[in-house]
Design a protein with these regions (language model features):
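Active-site beta->alpha N-cap acidic-glycine motif
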Residues: 49-136, 147-150, 154, 160, ...
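A cross-domain feature marking catalytic cores of carbohydrate-active enzymes
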Residues: 76-78, 103-105, 127-129, 166-169, ...
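A short acidic, helix-capping loop that chelates divalent metal ions and anchors anionic groups
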Residues: 132-139, 226-229
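Divalent metal-coordination and catalytic microenvironments
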Residues: 77, 92, 101, 125, ...
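N-terminal pre-catalytic segment of deacetylase/amide-hydrolase enzymes
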Residues: 1-74, 82-90, 94, 111, ...
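Charged helix-capping and loop-helix junction motifs
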Residues: 143-148, 202-207, 233-239
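His/Asp/Glu-enriched short active-site or ligand-binding loop at hydrolase and phosphoryl-transfer sites
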Residues: 5, 163, 171, 177-212, ...
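Catalytic grooves of carbohydrate-active enzymes
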Residues: 210-260
């Protein structure tokens, strides 16, 4: 399991940068024309790393759980969707399975009853930014902070404070660590996905997931409406095949918080009685 956010200022990117400078300085006195190579390699890493959800180059990311048992966690991005999420919740109920929903703030604001339904059925909710801007990591630090904070404030109205943030499209940048440190949040990505392009490609979804699943997998799916007349029905069938396939392989579907050993969400506030608000009781517990 990749380590969670520890609040440390130095990241692998810092270490790589300092190392590149040191090696470059040494090469300058040995063979001047070679001095640029370490710096060029470092810049290449900086260009590629944002697009590697498991890399943890700019900050610690959690992309999987422990490998010591056949367990996996189901996560759903980009919702809630009034055409898709209710049927998905019924399917999860039928098999008594927990899931984590990384919700988009604007969709949560449009469909508050779906957030309440997700929570009342014992699932967890994470932060997936407010607008799901695929270019968010190219925006300013202020814009990035606003996107995450606005969603946190919105979800606090449901009695919860997500501790988990999943960046849109899984892309990170050097500004994200400071924002998450301020909000006391972890960056949680994934280790098993089907390349469904936000449910634009659902044919063979289950086959692709079951081929790539591994012990400790954080499975990425999307609860948004696919195209086509039978799109939603076909997608739900694929999700059910994933559930049945995991069971046939001996996997246990567990809450994400249990898989990674860290809280995914917590109560936003405690009522005067000191108890946990009803809407947040037993997150992800089935």
């Amino acid at each position: 399991m990749k380590r969670a956010f520890t609040g440390k200022i130095l990241s692998p990117a810092h270490a790589a940068g300092f190392s590149a400078l040191a090696v470059s300085g040494g090469l300058f006195f040995i063979r001047e024309e070679m001095a640029v190579a370490p710096l060029a390699l470092f810049l290449l890493f900086c260009l590629v790393a944002p697009f590697l959800p498991q890399a943890g180059f700019f900050l610690p990311v959690i992309s999987r759980g422990a490998r010591d048992r056949l367990a996996a966690a189901l996560t759903f991005d980009d919702g809630p969707d009034p055409d898709v999420t209710p049927g998905l919740l019924e399917l999860l109920d039928r098999y008594r399975l927990p899931a984590t929903f990384f919700v988009v703030g604007v969709e949560a604001e449009r469909h508050p009853m779906l957030i309440r339904e997700i929570l009342s059925r014992g699932h967890a909710v994470g932060n997936h930014s407010y607008h799901h801007d695929p270019l968010l990591m190219l925006r300013s630090r202020t814009r990035l902070s606003d996107e995450i904070t606005r969603t946190q404030e919105l979800l606090a109205g449901f009695g919860i404070r997500p501790r988990a943030f999943r960046p849109p499209v899984g892309i990170t940048n050097p500004r994200l660590p400071g924002v998450l440190r301020t909000l006391d949040m972890d960056c949680i990505t994934f280790s098993c996905r089907a390349g469904d392009f936000g449910n634009r490609l659902i044919r063979g979804l289950a086959k692709r997931i079951l081929k790539r699943v591994h012990p400790g997998a954080i499975v990425l799916l999307h609860d948004v409406a696919p195209s086509g007349v039978r799109g939603i029905a076909d997608w739900l069938e694929e999700v059910e095949q994933i559930i049945l396939g995991l069971k046939a392989k001996g996997y246990e579907v567990v809450p994400l918080s249990q898989l990674i050993g860290r809280p995914v969400m917590e109560p936003a506030t405690l009522p005067p009685s000191g108890g946990i608000p009803e809407i947040t009781r037993g997150p992800e517990e089935k």
